[in-house]
């Protein structure tokens, strides 16, 4: 089937002007996730913030109750006993100066990055490489920590990091099309709660303004915010 015809078919039945209750929206998205692979179900929040101002940044991490369905590769910058702890917890890549050199050379073999506090002067050199990818370790989201085992377990077990983009949008994957509707809704409500709690002091007016859900290859479905809040 031609791409244009496929898109037209999957968009059928979606009212672009309507806000759907979350359960109905997820059902519609799942029905239209017809690719041969297990598509990721994603959510996007349009927030009433201007991230150009330091007091309007939104960032955090949340453990989704049903995981993400995705296997993350976790890299840890640590030495000695903490490096051993990271390996025992299942970290995919562990190192210190050697790992910094690999990353500086363009080899990034992880999706999530964790560091012990003493490693940050070294890891700081990687800001231009890891920063744009959203991978820079940060104590505010628990990726600069002495509890490397806990951080690795969290990353492997379904922790989702979120961060507002320039246009005031937070996007995140909250599961797979193979998940039940109930599990996806539970994950969405957990993420929404975390985003709500991360509301910055500088935010004015309505905080969560618009919400939409979609699958990797499918169309977006607008959500009634009241059905995912609280």
Swiss-Prot record:
Signal peptide: none annotated. The keyword Phosphoprotein does not apply. One of its GO terms (cellular component) is cytosolic large ribosomal subunit. One of its GO terms (biological process) is regulation of translation. Part of the 50S ribosomal subunit. Binds directly to 23S rRNA. The L1 stalk is quite mobile in the ribosome, and is involved in E site tRNA release. This is Large ribosomal subunit protein uL1. The lineage of its organism: Bacteria, Pseudomonadati, Pseudomonadota, Alphaproteobacteria, Hyphomicrobiales.
